[in-house]
Each structure stands twice: as C-alpha cells, then as structure tokens.
Design a protein with these regions (language model features):
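Phosphate/NTP-binding elements of NTP-utilizing enzymes
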Residues: 1-225
Length: 225
C-alpha cells in the first residue's frame, strides 16, 4: 500500500491519494503513512526523479515548488499529494475527498467504516466513469473492534462496488463470492524461499503448533494474538 501511494506521488501529476483510519495511531508511528514517507525519502535520496515539496507535514505531503511570476509566487511542479485523515468516529469527514487512490487502513477496527465507504463512493464516480480506486484492508480480532462493517463489505463485494473473488477460503461457500483473503501462511516471515515463494504447508504446521501451545494459557485471549 505504501508503494502504491509513492508511485502516484512521483508519477501521477496532480493526484490526490488518501489514507483514512479510525485512529491516528494507525497512520503514523508504525502505520501506513509512516511507511509511505519512508518510500518517499528513499526515492528522493537514491533516484534521479526526486521531488521538491510544497507541503511537508506529518499527515500531508505535496510535491512541487514555488516560482515567482509577475511578482507573485505560483505553485508549480507535479503537485501530487498524499493525505492521512483520522476520522475519530466521524465518518462524514471523508465527504468531498475524492482521489486516485483511497485506502481504509485497519478496516477491521474502524468504527463507522460502512458509512465512510458509502459517503466516499459517490465522490469516486463521474457519470459512468470511475475516477479512482478504494481499498479497505486489515483484520479484526480485537475485542470490540467493530469488525461487522468489514465483514459486510467482504462478503457482499458487488453491493459495494468491490471486485469479487470466488470464495475458496470458507467451508461450504462454493459458488459464492467475497473479497480477497490473504491467510497467515502467505508471506509469513521465516517461511519464504529464495525466489520469494511462500512455503505455505510448513507455515500452516508452524502456526498450528503455536496455537496448540497457547491452548494451555490461562487467558483465552492469547489465542487471538
């Protein structure tokens, strides 16, 4: 996700790219925005297509520069942007924020996700044309995480203008569609070969062994970790 934001920032002129989250902590620190900023810094430092910045804030970066024209400072350059927005239980904050790329970070712990998604959808269309791409991702598992909205979108993708995939993950779901699911055994650290392929069967065995160990814990919540 961070690389997708960086791609648009450097190569799609005037693009607006948003990351929405229920809490600011999901955006910065070890969050998606911080990872995107690392991409920008690396590319600026190590490539020939670095970009000057008109805005350089914790939650907002905008490429470009200022030039004096007839005594006035004019903003020039790519003018592509990456913006983070913490909704804080106020999904209406997404209103009017259309972009080439819109992420809903930690969607499994996102109060008001369904309303935020439905408010954003009309801004991404112009007649029969779709102007950008919306992606909701992240897992649930935390007690009180409000996972129901993510579950609704995941199991009814077409109703929310999402790409549907054959459901090959749930038992008894043959012939139904859902969102795209990435199981824990895919890309699990320590179980990837030299060519980058996941050693899924070995990863499953490892995960089952770890879960078996946790069954003896006094706190049942340890199984959710």
């Amino acid at each position: 996700a961070g690389s997708m934001l960086a791609r648009n920032y450097f190569f799609v002129k005037n693009s607006k790219n948003f990351v929405f989250a229920g809490q600011k902590e999901y955006l910065i620190g070890d969050g998606l925005l911080s990872k995107a900023w690392e991409f920008l810094s690396f590319i600026d430092d190590h490539t020939a297509w670095s970009q000057p910045r008109l805005r350089d804030r914790e939650m907002h970066k905008m490429s470009g520069y200022k030039k004096k024209v007839n005594g006035l400072e004019i903003e020039m350059g790519m003018k592509s942007q990456i913006l983070g927005v913490s909704l804080k239980d106020n999904p209406d904050k997404v209103r009017g924020k259309a972009g080439e790329l819109v992420f809903f970070e930690e969607a499994g712990s996102f109060p008001g996700l369904l309303k935020a998604w439905e408010v954003t959808m009309p801004t991404m269309r112009q007649g029969s044309k779709t102007l950008g791409m919306m992606i909701a991702f992240g897992t649930g598992g935390t007690e009180g995480s409000d996972f129901e909205a993510m579950e609704e979108i995941f199991y009814n993708p077409e109703a929310y203008d999402c790409m549907g995939y054959e459901n090959k993950w749930d038992e008894g779901a043959v012939g139904t569609t859902c969102g795209y699911f990435i199981p824990i055994q895919r890309n699990l650290d320590g179980f990837i070969d030299d060519e980058g392929n996941s050693k899924e069967q070995v990863a499953v065995e490892y995960e089952e062994e770890m879960r078996e160990k946790k069954k003896g814990a006094a706190d049942a919540k340890s199984l959710d970790q």
